[in-house]
Amino acid sequence: MKGEIYMIVVRQRDEKDCGVCALLSIIRHYKGNVPLEKIRLDAKTTNEGTTALNLILASQKYGFEAMGVKLNSIYDIKQFPAIAHMNLKKGYTHYVVIEKITKDKIFIMDPAKGKVVMKVNDFICEWSNVVLLFYP
């Protein structure tokens, strides 16, 4: 098992808030706390949501080193928690926090649904191969 951790669930109130809620969950995981509204402002969230770059830049304001990477395999993720960028079947993009990965399951904190366990193959069908990594 990789990355046995416990993530704090931060539920989104708005469709556009998945990215900032995922970032707030990362911040709280490392014992920080920033008001969601401040993260929205710092990440330049619009009615379309938040870009990966703006999530990275906002996290740097809170003391994180962060980077976005495009990976060939979900198993290439070595730093947990990580934010995954998703392309949902309904045509929306979405962000979730990966807590851990096993051989056939992925444990995530989904700002829209809470704690979710997915089959790796199902996750891969919606994953854009992009993850955001954070180092406190």
Predicted regions, residues:
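Conserved active-site-adjacent core of cysteine acyl-enzyme catalytic domains
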Residues: 1-126
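A contiguous loop/helix-start segment that scaffolds small-molecule binding in enzyme catalytic cores
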Residues: 129
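Cytosolic-side membrane-insertion boundary helix
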Residues: 134-136
